[in-house]
């Protein structure tokens, strides 16, 4: 009996989709990642970045994924951010870099798009460009970026307060980033936080993925369950 064509197509499609998925973290060690060893480790099955009073970061530093520079992709992971007391009342600042470039390899520093996160109630979910144009979209905004860093707010994808209410402080949350051409979308716990179309010539079309550990007061950030889907 010959296979039904539609069934063959379905199996092939599923195989290709599976082949395009990649786990970026083995849950055991930092194989495939590179950063400053005094800050990064694996604890309780999660990538852990930590600064302390005894070992502060002199500037923002990053853990950089070593296996490519994705262009169009969907990236999901879980993150947890806490202050020095293991809560969310104090300082805590991190982010997921994408389509970024290494600018200071000796201290693992990158520049580029950042899906931002913090312990506070304002910036978690915004699109920021590290060492570049700064804030590109506030939480809840739909924007188009023109030449000369002209940012046009064209609509909204949600209310900032509602997005914040869905974020679990000092607990695990899910970040999703979707990048296709100049269209960038970010989601936290299923809620879209920004929708950005970068039409400028400086908008990166591909680059490294990295995790930020922000300079400042002691804090801890953890990441796990990375899945990268590419076209």
Model-derived segments and spans:
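Bacterial N-terminal signal peptides that target proteins for export
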Residues: 1-8
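Hydrophobic h-region of N-terminal signal peptides that target proteins for export
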Residues: 10-19
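Carbohydrate-interacting regions of secretory-pathway proteins
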Residues: 18-231
